A protein has these predicted regions:
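N-terminal nucleic-acid-engaging modules of covalent nucleotidyltransferase systems
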Residues: 3-172
Length: 172
């Protein structure tokens, strides 16, 4: 006689479910590291030494211009997404490595202004969003989906850490 199973695992809306799979071990980042890798490493380093995490964010923001716009979108209460909430229907980029994807947030962060204002019609804005998600690496697309919905997956990269890393920028 077989034993009865006890429970079905974690319930669907469980609060302790990770928002996104993060890198958990420290790595040396290359000069062309993508935003997901930079923020994962900043999250790991911030657990041990906040000053090193701040320095890393400022250095890698100079190399990848998308770090600061993502932090502003995530932490600035004056910046609100004009895109519909919930998952976006798009075809995930199947590039085997992040540097083999069609594009990266490093080049596409200039489009962010259209996703937080009413400058373009809603249908065009949603089309631009889907095209952005389909062109960038999968992990960056997952990150952008969460940021769009107001969810921040990096618990140690906080608003105060961002304010210390970029003192000349105001995060309201």
């Amino acid at each position: 006689m077989s034993e009865k199973k006890r429970g079905r695992g974690r319930p669907k809306g469980s609060p302790n479910k990770p928002k996104m799979e993060l890198i958990t071990e420290r790595q040396t980042l290359t000069n062309n590291a993508d935003v997901y890798e930079i923020l994962c490493q900043a999250d790991i380093v911030a657990q041990e030494d906040e000053a090193k995490a701040i320095h890393g964010l400022t250095v890698f923001n100079d190399r990848n211009g998308a770090v600061l716009p993502i932090l502003r979108w995530a932490f600035d209460s004056n910046i609100n997404s004009t895109l519909p909430e919930g998952p976006t229907p798009y075809n995930k980029n199947e590039a085997p490595a992040t540097d083999l994807a069609e594009t990266s947030l490093r080049f596409e962060h200039k489009l962010f202004k259209y996703f937080v204002t009413e400058e373009v019609p809603q249908t065009r804005r949603e089309t631009m969003w889907i095209e952005l998600l389909e062109g960038i690496p999968q992990k960056e697309a997952e990150l952008m989906e969460l940021v769009k919905d107001g969810v921040w997956p990096f618990p140690n990269v906080t608003k105060s850490l961002a304010e210390k890393a970029f003192p000349n920028i105001t995060f309201n």
